[in-house]
Structures are given as C-alpha cells and as structure tokens.
C-alpha cells in the first residue's frame, strides 16, 4: 500500500517534511528525531512503527493514514490551536529545534501529560464522565468518523466498555456495521476481539453473521496477534488461522541446527526455567507473554532504526532505547524484570519465545504437562498460586477470571489498566550477586522506613503543638476585638475568628485535590480551627531525611494539606546591609515586641514567629532585598519616613479593609489549591489594590514605630507577591516553570501580607482602647 496521502505529509510534532514513522495509538506521523522520543516514552504512551520497513496489516496502515490526513493531530494540540491560549507561552517544536530538551519536553507534554488535549468543562465525577463518553463511543463506532472516536478515547472512553442496556461492546457494534478501521482503532486501544456479548457471541461472530468475512478474519488475527508476532519474529511466518492458530519453530531449529546462535538453549538452567514457566498461573503467564511481546517490538524497531539512520548524526546514546521504558502502571519488580529482557542474547531470547509459544498452545488446548512439577522448588508466590487452583492443565471456565485460557493478543497488547502483581523474569537463574544486592536493598529500605516513621512521629507532635498555639492566639484575638471590660476567654475560637486572616476554611465543601508531595494525594483540606490535631497528624507523610535537617515546620492557620511551608533560609544565611529599610523594619519590630507584651497582649501576634534579631522576611530575605531595590517599592517605603503623624484610623475601617485583603488572599489560595496558576496574576493585582487601600487609611508618616514596620512589611510583601505571580508566565516561550516552588513562594508572600495586616489590626485595636 502506498504511504502517500492526498497532501504533503509532515511530522505531527515538529512539522519536518517526509515523516518515516507512525504512532499507531495517536494516529499521527512523526520524523526520525521525534520518533526517538516516542520510543523512549514506551508503548503504553505511543506505539510506533516504520512506514516502509516494518510489516503492516493493510487495514491498520489505512487506519493510521486516515487519522493523520483527517486532523487527528489537532486532538493532541487542541489548546495550541486556540487563539485564546496563545498567551500561555507554549509553542510547537520546529524542525530546527534540538531533540533534547526542546522536542522531548514538548512531546512528553503533548502525549504523556496530555497538556494540550481539550479538557471537559465539568469533571466532578470522573466515573460518570467516563461512562457517558464510553456510551458515546458505543454509538459512534457504527459510523466511519475515526477522528471522533479517537477524540472520545483521548478523553477517557473505554474501548472495552460493556453497554448495560444493549449488552454489547463498541467492537461488537463496529463488527456488525462492517467498520474495519473503527475495529482497528478499538483493538489498538485494548478492545478484545474475543469478548462475548450478553448472549455469548463475540465480535467475530457478529462480523460473520453480517457478511463481513474479511473483517472477521482480521479480528481472528488480532485475537492471536501476540503469538503470531512472536512466531514471525523467529521464523518470518504466521499461521493462516484456517488450519491452525500456532506455529512453533522449535522442531525446525532442533533438526537443522544451523549454528549455535540459532539453536535452542538446552542447558539445565533453561530446562528449570521452562518448568517454572509451566508452573505459572494464567495471570502471571499472561503478564510474562505481554512483556516478551513488548521486548520483541523494541528489538524489531531497534533493527529498523539502526538500518535507516545516519549513524554519524542521529544514532547517539540519547536516541537509543536500550531496554523497555518504565511503565508506571506496573510494579517496580515487574519493570525491572521487563528491562532485564534486554540482557538476553539471541539464543536465550529465542528459547524463551519458543517456550512461551509452546506453553500458550498447551494452555489454549488444555493439554497436560509432559512431566510432573511436584518436586520443583517454587517461590512462595508461585506456590500460593498453585494452592488456589485445581490444575494448570484444565480449561478455564467463564466464571474463573484467573483460570481463563490465554487471552487474545488484542487485549494483551494495550489493555494494561488492571492492577498487576509483580512478575520477576529473573526467577529462572538467580545468582549470588543478585541475591546479595536484593538483601542489601531490603535492609536499606527497612532502615529508611524506620527513619521516616520517626520523622512522621516528630512532625505529628509539632503539629499538635502548633494546633494548641493557634487556638490560644485565636482566643486572644477574639478578646482584643471585644469592648473594654472583663471578657472570659473561650477555650475554642469562634466563627468570628476568621478575621485572623488566611482562612480558606470558609469554603467548607470543596472537592479533594492533590496536595503537595509531603502529603497524601487527594487528602481532604480542612481548617486548623475546626479539625482535631490527631486527625490532621494521621494525614502527614514524612519528608525525606535530607530535607529535615535544621528545618522548622510552621503553620499559618490554614488547611494543613496545602499551606505548610518550610523555612529554608535562616537569619544567619542572609546578608543585610545596615541601610536596608527591610532590615531596619525587622529590627525595630523586634525591639517593639517587648512594648507590645507590656501593653497586656498576653501572647505573641497570631502570625509572629520570627526570632529576636531575625529579619521579618527570613524565608526569602535575599529576594526581598533585591525587590526593595526597585524604584517604585523604594519610594513607597521611603514615604513612611519623615515627620511623625500621631493619627490612626478607626478600628472598624482597618478591620473592613483587612477583611477585603483576607478575601482576596483566600481567592489566591484557592487557585493555588486547585492548581489554577493562570489565576495568580489577577489575584495578586486584587491583593495589591486591597493592600494599597488599607495602607491609605494610615498617615504617610505614622508616629508609632510598630505601625511603620507593619506598613513596610505589608507594602513589600504585596510588591513581592506580584513579582512572584508574574513568574507563572515564563519570559521566554517554552521555558520551564517550577510551579510547586513558585506556589510555595506565593503562599509565603500571602503569609507575610496576612501577618502585617494582623499586626495593624492588633495595634489599632490596642491604641484605640487606651
């Protein structure tokens, strides 16, 4: 079949002309350089095949060209094509760009992170959404609109979805309608050609009954694709599926004995490995067969890659794929076993493939083993599998999912969403060195677990201390807000304590979101003031040990899951000049701490956690000094100096402006919690406006030094917040942005603003009472 389409073909990722590779699962054509990145992602992300030098079923190649020519690439680049999204700074790679890091980062974002795919407007219930999408897919496959079905699959529709009302899967519908290309696409995404409908009929039966005999034969080939691909890799032949479904090249190799590299490995280790292979449960055997299938695909693509590339320019260490990439859906043990397959030489790998083909045929036909395995020394996992099953040689029933016959290759190629147990492929020959390495790694892991448990306990104690301190400070703040006179101090904060700022807890019903790395993903966010300390402590996950040395964890009366911040810079590590206004405000604020205590506050301010002599902006002191050098901020801070003005605004006005600042901070923190980084800039502008209005209540040259220090901190923090939020838009298109670090910096700025505003409320309230 000709690979030329109706228009000039270009690479879907960088627009290079004359692409030589195809991504089957994405429906796009890619050039050699971009293909190297696709291969490094793994088959679970992109299944690649050379357009000219690889063997193609005609209908599969037609399906890929149909998708590519009908704009399937726009599915994966939806937001890049939207003019409203151009301001994000992301751009498509060019042919002249370097593979690393420009092309590789773009391709990873496009296919692995799905950063440019159209997002549904409402995803509150992912289960309902996936079900609705799957029903749409069930209806769409009867038509010839391939790109619509690919779009539904990209949004989360399930190719093996069983319609509860109609009792069929999408592949049944496509087979009945004779939609061969739709069937190819569904099989690529994991549809099983052997899955029965409510009456026990398969898609193959539907195609034959409707008179689509070529489609029925193609579905049979898809059903046995795994064993067909393994046999073709060894001998270049496939069964016709009319006279038989299996070709075992074992007999030909034994009789001919062409050379040592082509003969079977008949060592004792190989024989023992074959016995262990026969003793595997059907599920573990299926996993092993899928892993070997992926390794065959890698080796075939490697051979094509080496035969087609310019070795002086393209074949480098960074473009090679020496072993199977890690699949995050698999366990670490299984991923290690998959990668060890690359260490098999040609003879060992051929022996393994022949053993798998023989075992697959035996299990499919229900034949018994030729030799008993009672005396084998099996691992504990394999022995437990044996205890749970009657006989490996029996034909499985429909009800027993673990003892079903070897599933169709269409399902085993890509239907990887099920939870998998580990399957160590090195069980056949475990050397002493591997045993010692595993033992050492286990001891190291146990020591690390013990250390993390101690750290977790320490963090839990610290959390409870902070909880008690916050309750105490809230009670004091409530007391300060009461009219003069004896007022009993409540044991718990009231609802009016929300004026202590930073209270995103006002939003009581909020969907769980993924928190930062120090907490469990998806843990519910609750305010400190309303959640018991023990409950919050149980959610804590320990830091890595290297992150805990001399680091203090502190809280700002905010949800524990999001607004915990580490002090990473101490006072001794920041250099301040004597003339720095920020340093002077810090020192003056520290000197005034004793005055505040003599006025009868009874405790420190709600947000006061700086030490004597330590800058108020200790966490990012250097960044504040750099920011203070800006002319606008310098002029703002200098305006606080001069002849003193003893006047102070009313407490009600200060509280009113403080509430406005608090409201805007809550909006910013909600955006941070929901990872809406594009909302940072407008939120910071609102906060800056509210801070400006609050600062305008006070005289330009206040007489009280605490007021001047707090105003300095308030203005400086607002300017710094704007500066940090602007970093969400990179200065250069495509520049990487560390959003986790940036979010922590933004939260720190919000904390400093809240701290300064709280100090102004406290000072104004106290001065008005005197």
UniProtKB/Swiss-Prot annotation:
Region named Interaction with NCK2 and GRIN3A: 375-596
ANK repeats, residue ranges: 132-161, 166-195, 199-228
Arf-GAP domain ranges (all copies): 1-124
Coiled coil stretches, renumbered: 449-483
Residues annotated with Phosphothreonine modification: 373, 401, 546, 610
SUPFAM superfamilies assigned to the protein according to its UniProt record, in alphabetical order: Ankyrin repeat, ArfGap/RecO-like zinc finger
Tissue expression profile of the protein: Widely expressed. Expressed at high levels in testis (at protein level). Expressed in the brain, including in CA1 hippocampal neurons, in the amygdala, and thalamic nuclei (at protein level).
Annotated segments matching region Interaction with MAPK1: 420-475
Keyword vocabulary terms for this entry: ANK repeat, Cell junction, Cell projection, Coiled coil, Cytoplasm, Cytoskeleton, GTPase activation, Metal-binding, Phosphoprotein, Repeat, Synapse, Zinc, Zinc-finger
Superkingdom as given in the UniProt entry: Eukaryota
Keyword Coiled coil: yes
Gene Ontology annotations of biological process type: brain development; cell redox homeostasis; cellular response to epidermal growth factor stimulus; cellular response to lipopolysaccharide; dendritic spine development; ephrin receptor signaling pathway; immunological synapse formation; intramembranous ossification
UniProt remark on domains: The coiled coil region mediates dimerization.
Protein name as it appears in the record: ARF GTPase-activating protein GIT1
Origin species: Rattus norvegicus
Record lineage: Eukaryota, Metazoa, Chordata, Craniata, Vertebrata
Gene that encodes the chain: Git1
